[in-house]
Amino acid sequence: MYKKILLFMIALLSFTACSANKEVSETENVSKNEVESKDDNKKNITVTTTFIEDMVHELIGNDKANIELIIPAGEDPHIYVPKPEDFNKLTEADLVLYHGIHFEGKMVDALEGVGYAVTESFDKNDIGEMEDAKDASSMVEDPHFWFDLDLYAEAFTNAANKLKELYADDSQMLALIDENHDRYLKELKDLDKYNGDRIAEIPEGQRYLITPHDAFNYFSRRYDMTVMAPQGVTTDSEVANKDLEDTAQFIADKKIKAIFAESTTNPERMEKLKDIVKSKGFETEVISGHGRELLSDSLADPGEAGDNFIDMYKHNVDLIVDNLK
C-alpha cells in the first residue's frame, strides 16, 4: 500500500506543481471542514465522479458512510487536474471506486494504484471505439459507457459487490445492499422502456443528435440514433475547422432543426457551428442555457434536475425528443 500511496503522491505533485498558492490555501480550508464533518465510526468511501457517487447513494444511502467525491458536479473529468486535498480523499479511504476506460484523464495512473474500476469486468467487445481526437489515424476506447444501460447495470453490480466486500462483517448492510441492488436494476429496466418509447416519438428521418463532443455513441448504439460531434471523444482537444464544416454541411443537408450544448462544454462552439450552418442556407437552433443542456460527463448539481442518474437520463431524452420531434 505504501508504494501505491507514493506513486499517487508523485502523480499528484506532477499535476499540481504549477497550481497557484491561492488554490492550495483554499483547498486546505475545505479539507479541514471535511475532516471535522466526518464520522469516525463510518467507513470512508471515495468516488471519482457524480455517477459513481450516485451508485453508492442508491446502494447504501447518504448516511451510512463518509462518501467523498473528487470531481465535483459540472466539472469535466477528461481534463480535471487533481488537487492537494484529493490525496487525503484517496489515501484515507477504505474503498476507492472509479470509472476506468481512461475517463478520469489526468488521474488514471494514480487511480489504478489505489482504487477499483467499476468497468473492470467489461468485455472488450462491449466497449466502443472512437477516433482519437489527437490522431485521426488511430482509435481509442470510448469511456462514456453509462449511456448503455446494460453496461451501467454491470458497473452498478460491480460497485455493489465491492461494497459487500467492504461490509462483509455487517449482515444488515449486506442485506441493504442486496435489496437496493435488485430494486435499482428494475428501475433501470423501466428507464430503458421509457427512453425507447419517447425516442419513438421522433420520426425516423429526424433522429439525428448533434452534440459538442462524442459522449453519446453508446446512446446511439442502444436507441438507433445517428450521433455526430465535431470534437471527438474528449473535451481537451481543439475543434478543427474541417470538422466544423463537415458537421455543418451534414446539418444543412439533413435539415436538422436543433443541435445541443452540453453542461461541461463551451456553448460558444455550438453557436459557431450554428453560424456556419446558416452560411450554407439552413437555420438550426442551439439548445442551451441553464436546465436546457445535455448532461454527459457529469450529473447536475445537487438539488437540480438531473442530479441522479435516472433523472439525468430522462432529462436528456426529454430534451432531445421535445426539440427534434
Residue ranges of predicted features:
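Extracytoplasmic metal-acquisition and chelation regions
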Residues: 18-325
